[in-house]
Curated annotation (Swiss-Prot):
NCBIfam families: PRK13261.1-1 (NF009751). It comes from the Bacteria. Signal peptide: none annotated. HAMAP family: UreE. InterPro entries: UreE, UreE_C_dom, UreE_N, UreE_N_sf. This is Urease accessory protein UreE.
Length: 152
């Protein structure tokens, strides 16, 4: 089995690829199947969030694997009004929903309850199978390092 131990920070010739959903791309240890059918193990530093296009390598550098973000069931909100989009971000963030934020568009794992909530704000919510690349704060190891205590 191939053991992938590091993420590379510059381009290298790719020897294979692996398509992974976000639930695996946030793990530092996992057994995965490369797109060519070979098995590989992730043995990466903790707190690393893999993105589509990232390159992983074995210790000896003989294998360079490109990460592909798998299409997932997502809800998609498209809106030209920055105020409405900000309201949607606020309410989803208040519920600690992992969220992908792009100009005029939001994506989150499909959830009909959240879809209905956003429709109450007159937002258009659709369902799609697309790569999901949420903001890193929802997944990195320091995501919840802030204090919830308040002093007055």
């Amino acid at each position: 089995m191939i053991t992938l131990t590091q993420r590379l920070d510059h381009a290298h010739p790719v020897t294979a690829s692996v398509t992974l959903p976000i639930d695996i791309r946030v793990k530092s240890r996992a057994k995965v199947e490369l797109n060519d059918g070979r098995e590989a193990g992730l043995m990466l530093p903790r707190g690393l969030l893999l993105r589509g296009g990232d390159l992983l390598s074995t210790d000896d550098g003989n294998e360079i694997i490109e990460v592909i973000a798998a299409p997932e069931s997502v809800s998609v909100v498209r809106c030209a009004d920055p105020y409405l989009l900000a309201r949607a971000c606020y309410h989803l963030g208040n519920r600690h929903v992992p969220l992908q934020i792009m100009p005029g568009e939001l994506r989150y794992h499909h959830d009909h309850v959240l879809d209905d909530m956003l429709r109450q704000f007159d937002l258009d919510v659709t369902f799609a199978h697309l790569p999901f690349e949420p903001e890193a704060g929802a997944y990195t190891s320091d995501a919840h390092s802030h204090s919830h205590a308040h002093s007055h």
